[in-house]
Amino acid sequence: MEPVDPRLEPWKHPGSQPKTACTNCYCKKCCFHCQVCFTKKALGISYGRKKRRQRRRAHQDSQNHQASLSKQPSSQTRGDPTGPKEPKKEVEREAETDPLD
């Protein structure tokens, strides 16, 4: 075995680096490729800065869509007490006219 330079960090010793380069693949083989791959891929630990997600800007199409929605006639208000009473009466009449077996 060759003597190792004591000034080198243990992870920079010859033979400590894998022969193949690290990839972006997340398969089991690539997750256990080296210690760096294991911490980043398998454990999900990343010490880098988190990227900010950009907000999606509203396009003109979506503004037109909003305008068309406001032009549509609105349905009955929820608090209107006069609306649903008539159909109930019809159902009651049908139940009275149809005798059970």
UniProtKB/Swiss-Prot annotation:
Provide GO CC annotations from the record: extracellular region; host cell cytoplasm; host cell nucleolus
Q: Where is this site: Essential for Tat translocation through the endosomal membrane?
A: W11
**Residue numbers spanned by region Interaction with the host capping enzyme RNGTT:** 49-86
UniProt keyword annotations, A-Z: Acetylation, Activator, AIDS, Apoptosis, Host cytoplasm, Host nucleus, Host-virus interaction, Inhibition of host innate immune response by virus, Inhibition of host interferon signaling pathway by virus, Interferon antiviral system evasion, Isopeptide bond, Metal-binding, Methylation, Modulation of host chromatin by virus, Modulation of host PP1 activity by virus, Phosphoprotein, RNA-binding, Secreted, Transcription, Transcription regulation, Ubl conjugation, Viral immunoevasion, Zinc
Indicate which residues the UniProt annotation says bind Zn(2+) 1. C22, H33, C34, C37
Detail which positions bind Zn(2+) 2: C25, C27, C30
Q: How does it assemble?
A: Interacts with host CCNT1. Associates with the P-TEFb complex composed at least of Tat, P-TEFb (CDK9 and CCNT1), TAR RNA, RNA Pol II. Recruits the HATs CREBBP, TAF1/TFIID, EP300, PCAF and GCN5L2. Interacts with host KAT5/Tip60; this interaction targets the latter to degradation. Interacts with the host deacetylase SIRT1. Interacts with host capping enzyme RNGTT; this interaction stimulates RNGTT. Binds to host KDR, and to the host integrins ITGAV/ITGB3 and ITGA5/ITGB1. Interacts with host KPNB1/importin beta-1 without previous binding to KPNA1/importin alpha-1. Interacts with EIF2AK2.
The molecule here is called Protein Tat
Q: What's the name of its gene?
A: tat
